[in-house]
Structures are given as C-alpha cells and as structure tokens.
Amino acid sequence: EEEPQLVKLEGPDAIKALHTYGTNGIMVEIEMRLAPKVDYQQLIFCHKDWNTIFDWTDDFARQDHFKRRLITGFENPIPQYFKGLVKHFEEEEHVTFILISTDQSDEAKALAEAAGLRLAYDRPLADPPRPPYITDYTWNHTTLWALRADPTITYLQAGFGTDYKAKMEMLWEKFPGESLMHIEWTAGNSKMNQE
C-alpha cells in the first residue's frame, strides 16, 4: 500500500489474521487478555470398530463442560503412519486423540472405559512440551505423516456440515477402500463448545 493502514482487530476478528501464511502487516501494538493457565493431559483411545469410537468421540465433543483443546479421530490405517506413537496402537485400531484439562482427564477416561475403548496413551502436556505430543499428528500434520509412509496418497479436505456421519458413509459406499477418515471436531459453526 502506498499509505499503510492502521487496522485494529479485536476478539474473534483477530482469528482472521492467524493463519495468513505470509507477512501482510507489521504489528505496532498487541494487547492480550490473560486467563488462568490450564494444564492439559494428552489422551489417546482406541477401538477396532470405527462406529464405536466415532460415536463415542462425537458424543464426547458435544459435552459442553469439558475444557479441551483438541478432539481428533483417525480411521485405521492412518494411526499406523504415526512414527513415535505407532507402538501404542494395535494394527487394526481406529484412534481418538483428546487434549483435555488435566483435572477432567479421569472423567474422560471413565467415559471411554464404559464405552469399551482402550486407553493407549496418557501423558501430561509438559511445559515446555516434550515429544511425542499428539498435536504433532493432527490437522495437516496427519497428511505429512501419511505422505512420508506412502507418497501415492491423495489428500482431500472437506467440510461435511451437520450430517457428517451420513456423508462419510456415502463416500465409503461410492469409493470403497479409497477414503480414509481423519476428523477434527471444532467449535466453528457446530453446536460444540470447545475451549
């Protein structure tokens, strides 16, 4: 710009500038609201039946009282690509990653156990973090791990809307054996209230 603008972003509007992947401005002043520190626990649950673990994870994501930063589900064989964590999984298991407030982790583990899920990984998110930590395997990191294992994989990101389970099943029917699901539960436009 010939005449630089002063743009003030507050609250949710600031999120628009977080992942812009390039220099698009110079910050001249930053104000941050502080909140109490939350200690997080990294939990990984497994089950050999996709519907069992998916339904449990979806239900868990909709429970508003949990303070969590991450809820991710991986269809088998995606977890087999995760060097550093693969030793915690059995070969045919689907997995769910949860990053949850440490003081609520026992409740999450009890719910998972009641649903027949296996707890495969239970570690605090240390300060500073020490690998392996589950955030290194989620979002676009998942694709990088998969491509390291199999460079022929194609990646497609999709937003399914509110009837996402039916749309996933439709993909499996139309493309049997060709679609593997990696699901990130987000606050976004859903009814879920994530921290």
Regions found by a protein language model. Give the residues of each.
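FAD-binding subdomain of flavoenzyme oxidoreductases
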Residues: 1-61
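C-terminal substrate-recognition/cap domain of FAD-linked oxidoreductases
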Residues: 58-195
